[in-house]
């Protein structure tokens, strides 16, 4: 047990220590300052020349969003065409067939919005061609899209008064060539040394320890897993994700993959401070996020390492903790850490089955996604926190009788309306979606049965499975309580639309707020200015997040995870 806890502490220590210099480097990249990666400039110039883009041309917030949305629309069409025709495309040694239109819609939307929800099993539902030219490609592009959006907001904040927020295409390409690609190569090398396969051969015929013949899927796994983690994508090459021994072979590969999930989201907070020259603000935000993360880790590690009371009642020893749904080579502690790390971000990859975690652990996993502001996805995580800063500034200003201001710009009704809509959208789509699925189960069971039945677990846990699915979609996370039968028309289309709404409406709103504030006259700090980089304001922001984001979900948790906990 002590060794497992030491492993948890080591991984968190590595994250905190490395996120600071990486954040400084990211800020330099987006500012266009000299870095060690300048050797990539010829490649970047070639990309801009081929695409026909001038990277030095500044965009206003509307042009910025237009470019972002056009890019995503193009890749959606690209992905749909390849997925429904993959059975006839090259690099398919295992002869996997095409996806159905509803499954392709869900898959394409899911990977396009950085969610990576998988209603298929990777080794049988895709080919090597679509793994590389849809899945891996989207994992780079969607991560870079979120990072580019944050870079635009950082640029707008750093200027006193401006009508432009940078060039989307420039930020997008820099995110890929200077940040995501180098880190992916490092992590990929580590995985290859640990035994992760990298090749294009078909399934292997092997003889197991029992003397039975078995086929084992392989492929370009080591090329895809690093960006899966670093881009907070999470879509596994294999159906069981990083609990698969070829996707995550050893404890060292587990450390590398778990570290990869959170390092860029953590670094982006420091990048904000370096870019805007407001390190106190960055420390304040980082502190709130880190405290929330550590609280979640503490709860889940305790829950999983102390085992299941039902098994205790049977007189069975649980020296290694609750091992249901966990890999023996990794242990309960590493799985608990991963479960929080993957849900405080929009990653969603797993090294054990969340469906088998203790009820309160499942609640913490869901609350992380329902709050959706603790580090979050690369780029968009801080942007969600930015929404609550705007709300907290407005409320604080009203409480103390001061004009609401954020970094020298007045926060007025227009910005507040946008921020409120964004904040309320998240609980709305989760709770309405869950209510709809419960209604269909209760009042139209014939429809559910026609789709093969959804639930393998009735009662409290069955509600949790539906609740988790919509939560995961709305948070662009992609993990799931996999007792839910989700490859159906209802879940493919319902989740697909939740994914679209929950990805693009917040980004549009957050970039719009940044663009509107950037155009306003800069107001110098005075004795009456509400400081947003203090401990007091950090606590205020946390309170607003807890009240608006977390409390909305407690009635549903009372009927699902909490009720299940007290039934043990």
Residue map of PLM features:
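C-terminal catalytic subdomain
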Residues: 387-391, 396, 400, 418-457, ...
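Hydrophobic alpha-helical transmembrane segments
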Residues: 66-76, 138-148, 257-269, 381-395, ...
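P-loop potassium selectivity filter motif centered on the GYG triad
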Residues: 90-134, 197-259, 312-380, 448-501, ...
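Membrane-helix cytosolic exit motif
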Residues: 22, 303, 395, 437-440, ...
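A conserved hydrophobic secondary-structure block that centers on an alpha-helix together
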Residues: 126-200, 252-282
């Amino acid at each position: 047990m002590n060794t497992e806890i030491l492993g948890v502490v080591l991984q968190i220590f590595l994250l905190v220590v490395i996120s600071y210099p990486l954040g400084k480097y990211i800020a330099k990249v987006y500012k266009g300052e000299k870095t060690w990666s300048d050797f990539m400039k010829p490649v970047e110039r070639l990309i801009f020349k081929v695409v026909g883009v001038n990277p030095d041309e500044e965009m206003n917030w509307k042009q910025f969003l237009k470019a972002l949305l056009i890019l995503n629309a193009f890749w959606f069409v690209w992905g749909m065409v390849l997925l429904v025709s993959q059975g006839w495309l090259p690099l398919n040694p295992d002869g996997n067939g095409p996806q159905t239109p509803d499954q392709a819609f869900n898959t394409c939307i899911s990977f396009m919005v950085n969610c990576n929800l998988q209603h298929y099993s990777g080794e049988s539902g895709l080919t090597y061609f679509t793994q590389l030219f849809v899945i891996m490609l989207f994992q780079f592009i969607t991560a870079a899209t979120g990072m580019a959006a944050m870079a635009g907001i950082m640029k707008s904040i750093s200027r006193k008064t401006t009508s432009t927020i940078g060039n989307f295409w420039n930020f997008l390409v820099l995110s890929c060539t200077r940040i995501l690609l180098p880190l992916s190569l490092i992590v990929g090398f580590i995985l290859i040394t640990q035994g992760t396969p990298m090749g294009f051969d078909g399934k292997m015929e092997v003889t197991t320890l029992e003397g039975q013949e078995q086929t084992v899927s392989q492929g370009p796994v080591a090329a895809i897993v690093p960006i899966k983690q670093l881009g907070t994508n999470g879509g596994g090459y294999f159906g069981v994700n990083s609990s698969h021994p070829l996707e995550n072979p050893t404890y060292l590969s587990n450390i590398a993959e778990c570290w990869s999930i959170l390092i860029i989201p953590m670094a982006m907070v420091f990048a904000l401070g370096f870019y805007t020259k407001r390190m106190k603000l960055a420390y304040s935000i980082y502190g709130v996020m880190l405290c929330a993360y550590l609280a979640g880790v503490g709860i889940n590690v305790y829950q999983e390492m102390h085992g299941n009371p039902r098994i205790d009642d049977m007189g069975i020893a649980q020296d290694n903790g609750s091992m249901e749904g966990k890999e023996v080579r990794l242990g309960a502690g590493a799985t608990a850490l991963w479960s929080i790390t993957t849900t405080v971000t929009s990653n969603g990859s797993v090294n054990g089955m969340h469906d088998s975690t203790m009820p309160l652990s499942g609640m913490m996993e869901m609350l992380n996604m329902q709050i959706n502001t603790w580090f979050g996805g690369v780029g968009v995580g801080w942007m969600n926190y930015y929404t609550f800063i705007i709300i907290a500034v407005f409320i604080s200003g009203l409480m103390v009788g001061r004009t609401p201001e954020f970094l020298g710009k007045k926060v007025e009704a227009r910005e507040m309306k946008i921020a409120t809509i964004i904040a309320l959208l998240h609980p709305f789509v989760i709770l309405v979606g869950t209510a709809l699925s419960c209604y269909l189960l209760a009042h139209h069971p014939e429809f559910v049965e026609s789709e093969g039945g959804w639930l393998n677990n009735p009662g409290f846990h069955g509600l949790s499975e539906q609740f988790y699915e919509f939560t995961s979609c709305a948070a662009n996370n992609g993990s799931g309580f996999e007792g839910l039968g989700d490859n159906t028309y209802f879940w493919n289309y319902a989740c697909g639309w939740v994914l679209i709404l929950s990805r693009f409406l917040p980004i549009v709103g957050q970039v719009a707020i940044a663009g509107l504030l950037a155009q306003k006259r800069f107001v110098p700090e005075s004795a009456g200015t509400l400081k947003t980089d203090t401990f007091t304001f950090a606590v205020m922001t946390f309170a607003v997040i807890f009240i608006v984001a977390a409390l909305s979900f407690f009635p549903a948790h009372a009927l699902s995870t909490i009720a299940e906990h007290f039934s043990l």
